[in-house]
């Protein structure tokens, strides 16, 4: 077992126009400390938080560092506030910010740029971001794991949550069907463009309030001939489930 570096970073984001926090788990390969050896380029996962979470919650509520250590996987955890991983109408361009982070960490860290070495995962709102980036940035990620995902974005927009303003994301128009916020629309666009959609591993607990939304999205994948892997089983919309799910996702990513 190797040691893991836990990096808490604050850097000035050109996209957001202010300093942003970023948490990174990085395997400390022996080549990093020996100038006579060629440094190893690591596989990495972009891990997206949910609506009530941030860049620290996977570190605090799961065993993500131990799972990453077991498989020598770098984990990149950004913070996007309540943005829905979108370029907000009244707010910051968080979709573009995630793309900025991808480029930034691959420049400053010993991460492989090969598509087959890059993965993306996230829960709830982060699951929504996961499927959105899988469909629109498919050249970057070989595999994607949406966990307890919001596949029907209208549900996110209609959500009554503490200090959450969906109008900040969408503008005054609350109708998102057929827009870049609509995962079903993005799926159709990817299929029409003959995009090489990343392999999908969808997980959701049967007690989760989003379970039937997940089944509906899977039904659509079946109808459109898009391959995927699916696991459900017992589990609610909580970190007890996401701890198990992210472990399964990491094992699948590196197999």
Located regions from the model:
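Non-catalytic cap/lid and distal C-terminal segments of serine-dependent acyl enzymes
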Residues: 1-255
């Amino acid at each position: 077992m190797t040691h893991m570096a836990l990096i808490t970073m604050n850097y000035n984001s050109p996209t957001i126009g202010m300093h942003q926090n970023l948490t990174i788990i990085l395997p400390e390969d022996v080549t990093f400390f020996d100038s006579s050896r060629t440094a190893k380029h690591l596989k990495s996962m972009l891990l997206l938080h949910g609506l009530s979470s941030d860049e620290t919650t996977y570190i605090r509520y799961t065993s993500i560092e131990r799972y990453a250590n077991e498989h020598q996987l770098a984990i990149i955890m950004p913070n996007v506030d309540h943005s829905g991983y979108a370029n907000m109408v009244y707010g910051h361009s968080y979709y573009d910010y995630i793309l900025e982070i991808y480029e930034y960490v691959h420049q400053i860290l010993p991460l492989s740029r090969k598509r087959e070495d890059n993965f993306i995962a996230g829960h709830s709102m982060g699951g929504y971001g996961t499927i959105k980036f899988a469909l629109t940035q498919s050249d970057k990620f070989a595999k994607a794991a949406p966990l307890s995902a919001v596949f029907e974005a209208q549900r996110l927009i209609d959500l009554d949550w503490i200090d959450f303003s969906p109008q900040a994301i969408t503008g005054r128009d609350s109708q998102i069907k057929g827009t870049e916020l609509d995962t079903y629309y993005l799926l159709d666009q990817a299929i029409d463009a003959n995009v090489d959609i990343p392999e999908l591993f969808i997980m959701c607990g049967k007690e989760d309030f989003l379970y039937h939304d997940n089944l509906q999205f899977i039904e659509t994948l079946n109808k459109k001939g898009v391959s995927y892997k699916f696991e459900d089983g017992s589990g609610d919309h909580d970190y007890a489930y996401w701890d198990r799910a992210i472990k399964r996702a990491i094992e699948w990513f590196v197999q």
